[in-house]
């Protein structure tokens, strides 16, 4: 029992380290499960299940949510183009960014900016 508890604490530390890493590097288009598993020297399946277990959300969903939240901030507080914002928040293409934005928020980037 003690060993399991210790392992969970280690898992929590890894999961929190992953959160910090994502928060600092959300703009990297290469940010992915594979990159994070490599960075933290753990397997992809372990990282995936650990993240879901500790945060109650899939890793890819968390990354997407962080990127969209940052984009919302840029849309409201800057005059940057949608293309530039999509690059800054880690999307390889403006189209995939716009689709993700609409999927997460329910409205388009231009509608959000006007609201």
Task: For every predicted segment, state its role.
Residues 53-92, 114-115:
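Terminal helix-turn-helix DNA-binding modules in bacterial transcription factors
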Residues 8-12, 30-33, 40, 61:
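Conserved phosphate/pyrophosphate-binding and hydrolysis machinery centered on Walker-type P-loop NTPases
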Residues 99-115:
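…primarily DNA-binding HTH/wHTH and HhH modules…
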Residues 17, 70, 85-88, 104, ...:
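Residues within well-formed alpha-helices
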Residues 35-42, 47, 51, 85-92, ...:
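Append "Primarily bacterial transcriptional regulators
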Residues 11-15, 82:
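The cytosolic transmitter module of two-component sensor histidine kinases
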Residues 14-18, 22, 63-68:
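Generic hydrophobic, amphipathic alpha-helix propensity
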Residues 1-6, 19-31, 51-55, 72-81, ...:
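Basic, amphipathic alpha-helical hairpins
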């Amino acid at each position: 029992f003690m060993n399991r508890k210790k392992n969970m604490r280690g898992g929590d530390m890894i999961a929190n380290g992953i959160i910090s890493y994502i928060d600092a590097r959300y703009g990297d288009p290469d940010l992915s499960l594979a990159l994070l598993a490599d960075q933290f020297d753990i397997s992809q399946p372990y990282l995936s299940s650990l993240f879901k277990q500790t945060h109650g959300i899939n890793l890819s969903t968390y990354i997407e949510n962080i990127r969209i939240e940052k984009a919302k901030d840029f849309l409201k507080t800057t005059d940057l183009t949608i293309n530039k914002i999509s690059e800054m928040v880690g999307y390889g293409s403006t189209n995939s960014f716009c689709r993700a934005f609409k999927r997460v928020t329910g409205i388009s980037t231009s509608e959000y900016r006007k609201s």
